Design a protein with these regions (language model features):
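Active-site C-terminal subdomain of aminotransferase-like
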Residues: 1-73, 77-81, 85-108, 113
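PLP-dependent enzyme catalytic core of the Aspartate aminotransferase-like
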Residues: 25, 107-155
């Protein structure tokens, strides 16, 4: 007889503990994301912002009707010429960890070019010059400074 997996009492307590602060964490992450995108939208190295509640998104009006928030996950398409520049940008970030699990308290980054080899860049459903971010609970000015200093590393 298999009754399926169950949580241990300690794991259940940890989950309940985390769920109690989830609305506050999402509110902070979303607010920081909106502020950061306002600061980055006019940066000369940012080609496009991919975030459903950003006015430049093709389905912005629909997102406004259906969503009360979009969280801290967004993508930037950068004005660069080579995948190596994307690597240089991501490596220059000092306060973002390379993403392995979205949704925690720390800010994360993931270069989309890491998903496929260079021979398949043209057939990838996502542009190779796209970088995905998750904004955690750090101070937004601190994160903006980090992104801006990494953008200065680009040609």
């Amino acid at each position: 007889m298999n009754t399926g997996g169950i949580l241990s009492p300690h794991d259940a307590w940890l989950m309940i503990r985390g769920l109690r602060t989830l609305p506050l964490r999402l509110k902070q992450s979303t607010a920081s994301t909106h502020w950061l995108l306002e600061q980055l939208e006019k940066h000369p190295k940012v080609e496009r912002i991919h975030y459903p509640l950003h006015p430049s998104h093709p389905q912005f009006k629909l997102a406004q009707k259906q969503m009360t928030g979009a969280g801290g996950l967004f993508s930037l398409t950068l004005k660069v010429h080579t995948p190596e520049e994307i690597d240089k940008f991501c490596n220059a970030l000092q306060h973002f960890l390379i993403a392995c699990s979205w949704g925690g308290h720390e800010s994360l980054v993931f270069p989309v070019a890491g998903l496929c080899d260079s021979a398949n860049y043209s057939t990838s459903p996502h542009p190779w010059n796209m970088v995905r971010f998750y904004i955690g609970l750090e101070e937004k000015e601190y994160l903006l400074h980090d992104i801006e200093q990494a953008l200065t590393q680009l040609k």
